[in-house]
Amino acid sequence: ILNINLLLLTMELVLTNKQKTNQFSHIFKNLKNISTDVEMHVKDTGIYIQGMDPGHICLFELELKAYWFDEYKFDSPLRLGIHCELIHKIINCKEEHQNIRLKTTNGEKLHVTLYPREGQSGITKEFELSLIDIDSELLEVPEVEYDADIEIASQDLANLITQLSVFGKDLNIKCGENVVFKGSGELG
């Protein structure tokens, strides 16, 4: 008799808080505008995402702490390559009364479930997303001293960028007594 024990590495993340499910959706809405694909590093402290725009000008990083999720389970650190546009389309199917569950076993496929909150009725939507192999190494993000600190709500910044992107792909931010956002492109 041959006895084989397979170790299935699993990860399950759940968001049930309405505000957090909306924030999670906005994260991928904005990521898809910066990068085509990202690699999620799932570890005991949370999820870490680092990426770069196609022109290799903008390096970004994002960390969602484990305690930010309503449920955070994982067996071992995982690296999940995700296509930003596709995950955004899936999460965008979420209705206001739905929770989000992300789950994978052995990092082969990402299962996204959008299901009604407790006490709510509705349809459960299940999606299976093929993960992609991203051959990248984490870059060291240097500490930088900035001449100006700007605090703005992420939704306000997203709205500004969306509105200015209508006029072109360039965005300049001028800091002085006032902060000025200027969008420009081929037409002006």
Predicted regions and their residues:
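DNA polymerase sliding clamps and clamp-related checkpoint/processivity subunits
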Residues: L2-K32, V38-V166, N172-G188
